């Protein structure tokens, strides 16, 4: 398939953006400027990849010719480089193909992550805490901002439920694969017989919604204030700072008591509610689109078992793509890059096959 016409359209768009960026009042609208700069960067990267692809194709053709030369030493050197050039060319083609696919605009969004302890009692709540710290460390490694929105601590130091927000460059693009049921196999500290217990935690990853994404009418909300039910301290239960919000048409419920200020809790609660409603809207649209097929990486649904963390064997297995790592300790310390790259590659191959570009 000849991608030159598509590339030329992207090149024209890049030139248009460069003209816009050069305007004196470009940064007056910071939000719009940020969106344009992101698009500009992606298109510039595509052009650089396209140029590298053409250069590599030419170099491969030159080496194939040199491999036929009468000079044995030169022919041998040229032939040795051919497999490496072929591998590089294959990757560059995949990168170009993927860049030409329609892009999900929510991939640039910040993310709201909700983690709930599942089966397994106290051990499940401890595992929910492990997952929270894993995402927090990953965010810190990438220079993203991490913020607690709401939590319900357990008696043993874990979480029955915890909600956080991660903000930064393309957060949702990297973390969208985390939605689903995470299973842990390990020996609890209280287990005297050394038996391995299995527990679960459910993760939901939602792109942060903007007001234009979801219309929330005031009459569709029921908002109540109440006293905080926190874990102690002089400010707990002294003022009615906790906020409960119900979205009447859908039944979605949010409670926020993380802040001492009722206004801040309401603001955070609305942020969570908006993300949940936006997620439901996106899921409904995705189900219509994919009704006749099954995504390789899955739907990201809360009921889908995606991963097992086996502590005795220091092993992590992602069941969607058959990925296995014996670096469980490192992964829980936030070293998620290899796993996420494998998931991104699997999604890319699936989307290319769908588009007939593989």
From Swiss-Prot:
One of its GO terms (molecular function) is translation release factor activity, codon specific. One of its GO terms (cellular component) is cytoplasm. The modification N5-methylglutamine is found at residue 234. It is found in: Cytoplasm. Keywords: Cytoplasm, Methylation, Protein biosynthesis. InterPro entries: PCRF (IPR005139), Pep_chain_release_fac_I (IPR000352), Pep_chain_release_fac_I_sf (IPR045853), Prokaryotic/Mito_RF (IPR050057), RF-1 (IPR004373). Transmembrane segments: none annotated. Methylated by PrmC. Methylation increases the termination efficiency of RF1. Peptide chain release factor 1 directs the termination of translation in response to the peptide chain termination codons UAG and UAA. Belongs to the prokaryotic/mitochondrial release factor family. This is Peptide chain release factor 1. It comes from Akkermansia muciniphila (strain ATCC BAA-835 / DSM 22959 / JCM 33894 / BCRC 81048 / CCUG 64013 / CIP 107961 / Muc). The lineage of its organism: Bacteria, Pseudomonadati, Verrucomicrobiota, Verrucomicrobiia, Verrucomicrobiales.
